[in-house]
Regions:
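Glycine-rich phosphate/pyrophosphate-binding beta-alpha loops
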Residues: 23-31, 124-127, 139-150, 208-215
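Extended C-terminal subregions enriched in glycine
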Residues: 132, 184-185, 218, 227-260
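Short, small/polar residue-rich loop motifs at catalytic or cofactor-binding pockets
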Residues: 9, 120-123, 189-191
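Long, well-ordered, tryptophan-enriched scaffold segments
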Residues: 1-27
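Alpha-helical support elements that line or immediately flank enzyme active sites
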Residues: 39, 208-233
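Active-site rim segments in enzyme catalytic domains, especially the processed small/beta chain
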Residues: 134-204, 228, 232-233
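Internal maturation/activation junctions in enzymes
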Residues: 43-142, 151-155, 162-163, 170-171
């Protein structure tokens, strides 16, 4: 697989959130989880919901649960199966998912799985911009400390270990999970640099670290800027919500119960 690998140009995908186009990486990554969450949350008027209020936290967490249920079911290498991007990112589908959110009660069960541990981090994020508006949004992770622990001879770097994120169970019995291991296939992975453009022009280059926290963090940065009127420094410094307990795309079959 390594000898046959060739880099490729990946077209980012976007949704419009209250007049702002938010751009993320498509599967085999998880960038569209942030876009799905924004589509769901766009149906709520956050100009009337205080930042950090119980209602703000509740709506954010419920949107995350719904998006991550799809993350576990559909996000995988598109070269090995159809990923229904247009459907997942449609406003119509977001409206259907939004209708599942109760204003005063948490979703008690969303199938399936559990998230990865987030207490220890192995990711770095960097962004830079020049006076002409050229931006770089860069994220890198070996996955779990020293990655695979293997260094190609004479090259001076260690290979990452994202293959751990393949599904291994049930892959030889149908129907197989879309993220099942196969030769030449890319595993689901979590690293997602992002951009925001406005009226076709660059506005913000951003990203966060932390596995399943990344789409949650992206959504909160966008909401802080667009909904809560924060400047860039405030949006980055503001306290963040992190929800654990949603479905996971790497083979765990235990459903989320009791609202995560």
């Amino acid at each position: 697989d390594l000898a046959a690998h060739q880099g490729e140009w990946v077209e980012p995908v976007s949704v419009n959130y209250r007049g702002y186009d938010v751009w993320e990486l498509p599967p085999n990554s998880q960038g569209i989880a942030a876009l799905q969450m924004l589509n769901i949350l766009e149906g709520f008027d956050f100009s009337k919901i205080p930042f950090g209020s119980a209602e703000h936290v509740h709506l954010f967490v419920e949107a995350k649960k719904l998006a991550f249920a799809d993350r576990a079911r559909f996000y995988a290498d598109p070269d090995f199966g159809k990923v229904p991007l247009d459907w997942l990112l449609s406003k119509e589908y977001a409206a259907q998912r939004r209708a599942l959110i109760s204003p005063d009660r948490a979703l008690r069960e969303v199938q399936p799985g559990t998230p990865p541990e987030l207490e220890e981090g192995d990711t770095i994020y960097l962004t830079t911009a020049d006076a002409d508006g050229m931006m770089v949004s860069l994220i890198q992770s070996n996955y779990r400390g020293m990655g695979s622990g293997m260094a190609p001879h004479g090259l001076g770097f260690i290979l990452q270990d994202r293959g751990e994120m393949f599904v291994l169970e049930g892959c030889d019995t149908g129907p197989a999970h879309p993220n099942c291991y196969a030769s030449g296939k890319r595993p689901f992975q979590t690293i997602i640099p992002a951009f925001i453009t406005r009226d076709g022009k660059p506005w913000v280059s951003f990203g966060v670290m932390g596995g399943a926290m990344q789409p949650q963090g992206h959504v909160q940065i966008v909401m802080n800027l667009v909904d809560f009127g924060m400047n860039l420094q405030e949006a980055g410094d503001a306290p963040r919500i992190q929800h654990e307990g949603s479905t996971d795309p790497t083979g765990a079959a235990t459903p989320m119960r009791d609202g995560g």
